[in-house]
């Protein structure tokens, strides 16, 4: 695999960027998750960051990347509407894994947003997208800029939803390299990794949640539901961070 020039790739149209990364992605598909992280650290530019929503299976990517690159900044975009269990899970994992946690929030508080816009998540797809732009996308863009990130690790998996089914290991998003080390893992592999390393699922897993975000746009899974239907009233799967 040849060295990749981020600036040159950013000059290309999106389709051409995908083609330019195709050979590298074919090789990365042959590596295991640890190998993909190691390759990225050896071949892609720093600074390096890892994002996490501290969701159901978050402990996997947090442990995996942090053990290979200790003290990597871990970006959390906090909406102010996470479940109490999520905030406690964040504290628990930060302490257990000695995470270098970097929390970013919207410039307007949750209460101020409600006063100004109403409950955006109740205003259809357009309202949800505006909410996500304010509380997820802008804080993440600010984090990447302030941390001088050029390579961004994330824990997305193809099995999680149709919108993620064709994602490659390596892409460019928001002007930086984005690496998805566990993109091809299934639920069994996740479980085995957690067991092997003495890690836990998010506490709401035991209450029937397959995916956990904000309290007002997350539902328990019920028979007959696809996993993506448990988020954003089934109107969309992504919060905006992993789109574009």
Swiss-Prot record:
One of its GO terms (cellular component) is cytoplasm. One of its GO terms (molecular function) is phosphoadenylyl-sulfate reductase (thioredoxin) activity. InterPro entries: PAPS/APS_Rdtase, PAPS_reduct_dom, PAPS_reductase_CysH, Rossmann-like_a/b/a_fold. The active site is at 239 (nucleophile). CDD domains: PAPS_reductase. GO terms for biological process: hydrogen sulfide biosynthetic process; sulfate assimilation, phosphoadenylyl sulfate reduction by phosphoadenylyl-sulfate reductase (thioredoxin). SUPFAM superfamilies: Adenine nucleotide alpha hydrolases-like. It holds the Pfam family PAPS_reduct. It is found in: Cytoplasm. It catalyses: [thioredoxin]-disulfide + sulfite + adenosine 3',5'-bisphosphate + 2 H(+) = [thioredoxin]-dithiol + 3'-phosphoadenylyl sulfate. Disulfide bonds: none annotated. Pathway: Sulfur metabolism; hydrogen sulfide biosynthesis; sulfite from sulfate: step 3/3. It comes from the Bacteria. Keywords: Cytoplasm, Oxidoreductase. Its EC number is 1.8.4.8. Belongs to the PAPS reductase family. CysH subfamily. Catalyzes the formation of sulfite from phosphoadenosine 5'-phosphosulfate (PAPS) using thioredoxin as an electron donor. HAMAP family: CysH. PANTHER family: PHOSPHOADENOSINE PHOSPHOSULFATE REDUCTASE. This is Phosphoadenosine 5'-phosphosulfate reductase.
């Amino acid at each position: 695999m040849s060295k990749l020039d981020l600036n040159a790739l950013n000059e290309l149209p999106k389709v051409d960027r995908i083609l330019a990364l195709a050979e590298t992605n074919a090789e990365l598909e042959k590596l295991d998750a640890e190998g993909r992280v190691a390759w990225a650290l050896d071949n892609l530019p720093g600074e390096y960051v890892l994002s996490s929503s501290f969701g159901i299976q978050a402990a996997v990517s947090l442990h995996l990347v942090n053990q290979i690159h200790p003290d990597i900044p871990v970006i959390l975009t906090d909406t102010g509407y996470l479940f109490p269990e999520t905030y406690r899970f964040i504290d628990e994992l930060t302490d257990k894994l000695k995470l270098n946690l970097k929390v970013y929030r919207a410039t307007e508080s949750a209460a101020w947003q409600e006063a100004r816009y109403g409950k955006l998540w109740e205003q259809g797809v357009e309202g949800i997208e505006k909410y996500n732009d304010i509380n997820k996308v802008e804080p993440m863009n600010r984090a990447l800029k302030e941390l001088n990130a050029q390579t961004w690790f994330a824990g997305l998996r193809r099995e999680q939803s149709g919108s993620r089914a064709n994602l490659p290991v390596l892409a460019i998003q928001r002007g930086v390299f984005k690496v998805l080390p566990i993109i091809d893992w299934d639920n069994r592999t996740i479980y085995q990794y957690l067991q092997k390393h003495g890690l836990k699922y998010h506490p709401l897993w035991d209450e029937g949640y397959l995916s956990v975000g904000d309290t007002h746009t997350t539902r328990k899974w019920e028979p007959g539901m696809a996993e993506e239907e448990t988020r954003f009233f089934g109107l969309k799967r992504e919060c905006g961070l992993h789109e574009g």
